[in-house]
Amino acid sequence: MTLSSKSIRRGAVVGALVVGVGTSVAAAAPATTAALHCGIYWGSLPKTAKITETAPMMNVRAGQHACFDRMVVDVRAGGADGYFVHYVDTVRQEGSGFAVPLRGGARLQVTVVAPAYDNYRQTYRPANRSELVNVAGWQTFRQIAWAGSYEGQSTIGLGVRARLPFRVFVLQGPGAGSRFVIDVAHRW
């Protein structure tokens, strides 16, 4: 074997390695891209569930996650499962129809079939109707405000950064209660 054929063979091996590494990087790119978007496929159309049970709501809380912000409405024993959540131009108060001002580029009206009262006694009384949970500095949520409870349902205004994908589901427990969960993605 001559010096030039060794050089050619060495060049071919190095070239094959470079092509192989390039192929590995290209193959890994889609997985990385999918991970960046968190696999969210929820969409932004209205979400609804029919009522099969109802019980009074007890609390509203929220949390931040890597891919979304989450709001939870806690419901007392007996559980509840009916809801209607959708983007609106203006969130309206239950009963009066007055506008509920909200910060953010888009507004979600969250209506749960769970009154904030039981036998004429309040089961949920927010300390500050305009700020149910402090979400200052959060990635997606801008404001969570109380819009009232009337005729067996309660409405919450959720101000968000922009019209983003969201999902809604009901979890049973802890105990005999249930939780309405609203997740809004950080991005599309």
How should each PLM-predicted stretch be described?
Residues 3, 30-188:
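Short linear recognition/processing motifs and adjacent strand/loop elements at protein termini
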Residues 1-32:
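Secretory targeting and sorting signals
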